[in-house]
Amino acid sequence: MDGRGLRPYMNTREDRAIRFLGLPTLLRSTGDDTNGAFGLVEHWSMPTGFASPYHVHHLEDEAFYVLEGELAFVCDGKWIRTGAGGYVFGPREIPHGFKVTGTGPARMLLLCAPAGFERFVMELGEDPDAPAVEPDIPKLVAVAAKYKIDILGPLPG
């Protein structure tokens, strides 16, 4: 342990798996692991056509690193397409979202700094072995507001 109270650790896909917005999701790091510095989430099997809502974070910045597949990101109304190895930064206070555009599933890491977004993910998380269901939008909006995230609606055209 160092002076900040942090310990090295490792996790596997089985350690902190949940289903978030119908997606198989893994909590790689939480604020508890990083002393509040960041949270790291892996969406490890996003189907073609999946789209996040257009939204704004007021407390944290988001960084997306695409591991597999093809995605389109929209940030402040501007679209960016990228594939494996692509990196997109979404600053707080700027509307953004993404959708899977390739012919197969996509996988990405989502880092939020400071930590906190992962608590939103955990609160909405479901049993990873349960079948995927459509998200409960009123619940999503209410829980997002608790974490200072505004859900603006579907992604812009």
Give the label of every model feature segment.
Residues 9-11, 18, 70, 77-95:
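Short acidic-glycine-tyrosine-enriched beta hairpin
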Residues 33-35, 46-50, 63, 70-72, ...:
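Short, charged/polar surface micro-motifs in flexible loops or helix N-caps
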Residues 50, 57, 71, 87, ...:
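Hydrophobic small-molecule pocket/channel-lining residues, especially in calycin-type beta-barrels
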Residues 72, 83, 92-118:
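Ligand-binding loop in jelly-roll beta-barrel domains
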Residues 1-3, 9, 115-117, 125, ...:
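Glyoxalase I/VOC metalloenzyme domain signal
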Residues 42-47, 56-74, 111-112:
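Short, conserved beta-strand element in jelly-roll/cupin
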Residues 122-157:
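Acidic/histidine-enriched, glycine/proline-rich intrinsically disordered or flexible terminal extensions
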Residues 17-54, 60-61:
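A short glycine-rich, His/Asp/Glu-containing loop-to-beta-strand
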